[in-house]
Design a protein with these regions (language model features):
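Bacterial N-terminal signal peptides that target proteins for export
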Residues: 1-10
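Phosphate-group recognition and catalysis centered on beta-loop-alpha active-site segments
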Residues: 23-338
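Hydrophobic alpha-helical segments, especially transmembrane helices
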Residues: 6, 17, 37-38
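Intrinsically disordered, low-complexity segments
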Residues: 2, 19-20
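Bacterial N-terminal signal peptides
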Residues: 9-19
């Protein structure tokens, strides 16, 4: 073989390797853009107008919260009670609150009563969500889960995923019991044939185990905050982790996930828990958690610097109030979205 053929062969070999490597890299590092409560930094949270905004921006997943009304209807709202910082009475007056500043419990209100609140006129935090870019939409109502699924039917080619957080609290039983709560949500999912287009997440891991027993097809995400994993004492585990004692099983995020692997598929932590340089780091890297079979989708990341840092760690997705910023980062560094 003469020198020219050797050089040609070598060039083709290198080019093939580069192309293969690039394809592999793109497949490995594609990122799921999850709009937190729709696009909370740009529009009222957990509203149809906010979800539509997120879809128009190109999210691959809508992340939102669900409660259940007095008449058993799953509605999309973050808190167990009507939040006076987010909603107004229909006449524009402030929400009536109790001595602790809470509005009426979702579970004590019918859907008709829920629909009477204006949840589009207020910005709950002008410092965190400056205007612009955020816009208010007066008279926007709290949507039902069914109404969101009907909105998604208008985008049949987008295959928008839903990340549904169930808002139950083991320390504050202000909702339906977990079985009734979960059953109401599952019924709407099944009615709309969306079991293969949703996952359900919760800080309250007991409800995740219940859902897995009822509908094993649905992917489940274990949420963990910077304190929810901590045991009460040496003999009493955190009430959030379904009986798993963080310190006793090994004291790392991967250790508690291994204890719950029968029903948890996705680890969804506060981003600080998976950042090795942060003092809240729980001892398991993104790669270690993924190698054990779990996807990693942290929350809530609103700065492009942290977005890029977590992308470099290899996370599967990012939950953000500003999906437009995440999309910008992905495009800037030529990283495909899922």
């Amino acid at each position: 073989m003469n020198n020219s053929k050797i050089y040609l062969f070598f060039f083709i070999f290198i080019l093939y390797g580069f192309i293969f490597s690039s394809c592999n890299s793109q497949a490995k590092y594609s990122v799921d853009i999850q709009g937190h409560r729709g696009a909370r930094g740009l529009a009222p949270e957990n509203t149809l107008v906010g979800f539509q905004k997120a879809i128009e921006l190109g999210v691959t997943t809508l992340e939102f919260d669900v409660g259940v009304t007095k008449d058993g209807i799953p509605i999309i709202f973050h808190d167990v009670a009507i939040n006076p910082n987010i909603c107004l009475e229909n006449n524009g007056n402030p929400i009536k609150t109790d001595s602790l500043g809470y509005g009426p419990l979702i579970k004590n209100l019918t859907l008709t009563e829920i629909k009477s609140f204006d949840c589009g006129s207020l910005n709950p935090d002008l410092i965190r969500f400056p205007e612009p870019p955020r816009q208010n939409y007066p008279s926007e109502r709290i949507p039902t889960l069914q109404e969101l699924f009907e909105l998604l039917q208008k985008y049949p080619n987008k295959n928008i995923w839903c990340n549904i957080e169930l808002k139950t609290n083991p320390n504050y039983p202000a909702t339906y019991p977990i079985n009734e709560f979960a059953d109401a949500v599952l019924q709407v999912i099944e009615l709309n044939n969306r079991a293969n287009l949703v996952n359900i997440q919760s800080f309250h891991w007991q409800i995740l185990e219940y859902i897995n027993d009822q509908q094993s097809e649905i992917l489940l995400a274990g949420l963990v905050g910077t304190s929810s994993y901590k045991s009460v004492n040496d003999s009493t585990p955190s009430p959030w982790l379904n009986g798993i004692h963080f310190e006793q099983v090994g004291g790392t995020s991967l250790a508690i996930l291994e204890e719950a692997k029968q029903y948890i598929n996705i680890f969804s932590p506060s981003w600080r828990l998976i950042d090795p340089t942060d003092n809240e780091f729980l001892g398991s890297s993104v790669k270690e958690i993924q190698s054990a079979g779990f996807k990693v989708i942290p929350w809530t990341i609103n700065t492009t610097r942290i977005m890029k840092k977590l992308i470099d760690e290899g996370v599967d997705g990012i939950i953000t109030d500003y999906p437009d910023s995440l999309k910008f980062v992905l495009e800037k560094f030529n990283i495909p979205q899922k």
